[in-house]
Amino acid sequence: GYVLEWQGAAVSAPFFRLSAGRTRSGTELFGQESDWCKSIACPVDEAAEDFLQEKSMKTERFFGMLEAEGVSVEKDAPKLVLTRDSAGYVLNVRAGRSSIEGERFRQLFELPSSCFFLEEQGGKMVITTKGIGHGIGLDQYYANALAKQGASAEEILELFFPGLLKKTE
């Protein structure tokens, strides 16, 4: 058998359904203690049927939901600033001096991914997402594509978690 180890300790390897084109870096999200979780390109994911998804709602409802979360939005000139990580996922949504984390925003609006884009269109806020899941660790869609091309489980794990795969006795 095999185990994933980092600095002598077994790690609980995260996984998710479908990336936004690449996986997220553990270091960017959680700091040095997650340095073992690397960002890698997942080139086949953009071809997935559910890669792009769109959700829309009335602008008043959208901003009302943000305000209920403590994000103060100026009514006359609402401006949201999105901060992204290197894989394109939203880390933070800021309106003036208040903000909400990207994952919390994802939960609030019931989005499939925190890789999202906002666009106001005729009284509606349109939220377009890429991928499904948190984007950390093993991308199930890409791993499945690699397996269908003949990659072994060990090769797939080594791709997503380089240097962590250890053979057990």
What residue spans do the PLM features occupy?
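Conserved, single-site charged/polar hotspot
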Residues: 1-169
